[in-house]
Amino acid sequence: MGEAKKVLIVDDSLVMRSMIKEILSKNGYVVVGQARNGKEAVDLYGTLKPDLVTMDVIMPGEQGTEVIKKLRALDGNARVMVVSGLNQKNLVIQAMENGAKEYVVKPFEEKDLLDAAMKTLG
């Protein structure tokens, strides 16, 4: 993978953030930040400049699909993958239209998360 890729994890669930962090960390990624909502995500993105963002869809405040749009406005090259418990076609389409590269449905297998991360960075 070369130089370790920096990741920002965005999810309102501490358990989910911890699980994603554990999987990515043991596979060579460096988790540089975690956010519980969209506002924190946008603030941290500007400061941390991560290579990859994992984004939940349903969180307090703005939906993840709107946050993706904001991140892409800040950085047209922002690489975002959605990790969500919702597998609704309209949300998948909206996330992709707003700039997400991959959509992983919870619960997920470790391999699925890692494959999506690699494709998003691709």
Write out the residue ranges for each language-model feature:
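Active-site beta3 strand of CheY-like receiver
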Residues: L48-T54
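Acidic catalytic/metal-coordinating carboxylates
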Residues: N37-E40, Q63-E66
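Two-component/phosphorelay signaling modules centered on CheY-like receiver
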Residues: L14-G33
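Conserved sequence signature across two-component system core domains
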Residues: V10-D11, A35, V53
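The feature encodes the CheY-like receiver
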Residues: P60-G61, Q88
